[in-house]
Amino acid sequence: MNEKTVEVSDQQDESQKIITDKIFALNQIRHTDPLIRALCTTWEECALQLVHDPDTFVRMECAEKWQACAELLFDDGDPVVRKVCAENYEHLAAKLINDRDENVRATCSKWETLVAELIHDSSPPVRRSCAESFHHLAELMINSSDWEVRAGCAIWEDLAVKLIDDVSWEVRAICAHHKKLASQMKDDSDWRVRVVVDSCLNETSF
């Protein structure tokens, strides 16, 4: 057994001990390796002490695993942390519905109680997320002037039928992922769509 193998084995043992022994984990929360600190968030007591850790990934783990941590992090300076809060906790998503970051707002749109407030958002990616999340909203948004929104509608096969001749190749490419439609799009004018068609017909559909 060489030195590197021993080192890897020791790391595995340490990781296993962290997730099974809270006292050991508490002694590791100041570890220099952020991945070790992230493992410590397995325990709520550790996570609460790591909630303001300088490493974004550690804070994300805190927010994802523990509601008490997420409630301290929903206004975190990093949008990826706020996004985790919005993704996992509906009441925090409600507080983030007007977040300055469009990815956070798009995540809020996954909640049925909040999506109605976002269908007219200024950001096309946010409106696209609304269309992707709820079929009944996609039906209302299918004639949007933004191709990104129409692309979101196209993930629904019954709506994609109405979009296979869309002016945007990006929208048609989404339509081409549906196997039942791909066979009708073999002669699409854009090679990028035809690539998707070929791939779909040779593999599986949505």
Which role fits each region the language model picked out?
Residues 2-206:
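Alpha-helical scaffold segments
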